[in-house]
Structures are given as structure tokens and as C-alpha cells.
Amino acid sequence: EWVPIKPKTDAAFLFSLIHVLLHEMPREKLDVPFLKQHTGSPYLIGPNGFYLRDPATKKPLLWDLKRNAAVSFDTPDTDPALDGAFTLDAIEVGADEAMWTHRGITAETAFGKLAARVKPYTPEWAEKTCDVREGTVRRIAAEYVEQAQVGATVVIDGETLPYRPVSIQFGRTVNNGWGAYECCWARTL
């Protein structure tokens, strides 16, 4: 299906699509185990916008729901929180090895920050920007989730892998000119 989007407003459409996925779809429709175990979504973010890290190892921290504590991302047998605010002691390492030590800081997860960031980008907002009707955005988001077949697998060369028959493809002009960064960022999500 071709969806005519006003030129250079692809990011608005994609941000609203992400909004629907994170704020209007049931959480169990998303691949939560993948987000928890194979992405930086559960990593805790410091006040300067960088990952909070273990002071001894400098490994990124996440909040483990089993232990009710911050642990390094590679700690075995964890149940990482995707949402919430948690109090902990940690360091934050920024660009050029700038380092901040935090005591009793309250931090959120990367996923929580993303969800908050895209909350204002409703399909109604996008319709005014990119000329795609809000109902079309919601329908496409629902089709995307339905066709993703979360939990389904496929065997390739004897290895069982997650089956992911859904993707968003770039066209030539999407990544050229102003607005390209935002569009590429949203598309990558």
C-alpha cells in the first residue's frame, strides 16, 4: 500500500506510529522479552542523558525486578524493568570520558524516556503535519503489530530464529536533506 505523505514529514508519521505502538497497543503485543534481553531499553539513564554505570566495572545498569536492585546489564537471571523510576548510586560516563558520581539518584529506563518522548506525537498531531489521516496511522500500526507475529519462529539452516516478516524500508529521498536525521532515527526504532 502506498501512503501519500507530505514531502519531508516522514518523521512525523513514524513518530506517531511509535506513539501508537507504545501508548495505545497492549504491551503484550510488543516483543517485550526481546526489548528486555537484547536492547538497551532497560538501561538506566542519568541526569546528563548517558547510561548509569556500575562504579567498579563501568557496565551499564538496569533495574532487576527479581532483586529489586540495580545490576549490571549482563547479570544472569534478571527480569529487567522497562518502565519506572528507581533510586540508586551509580556513575555516569559521558563524552570524552567525562564522569559524574551520583548518590541516591532517581533514574528512569531508556524505554521509559522513549515512551515519554513520543507521547505528544499522536496520530491527530501527525495528521496536521504529514496529511495522513489519524485512522490510517492507527490501522497501519495495528497491521504492523499483527504481521510481526511476536513469538513465531522460523528454522534457517537448522537454527530456530524469531520470525520477523515486517520491516520499514528507506526510499532514496527519505535520508536526504532537512528532517533526515529524525526520520532515520524513527525508522530505525
Residue ranges of model-derived segments:
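Acidic catalytic cores of enzymes that act on phosphate-bearing nucleotides/polynucleotides
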Residues: R138-L189
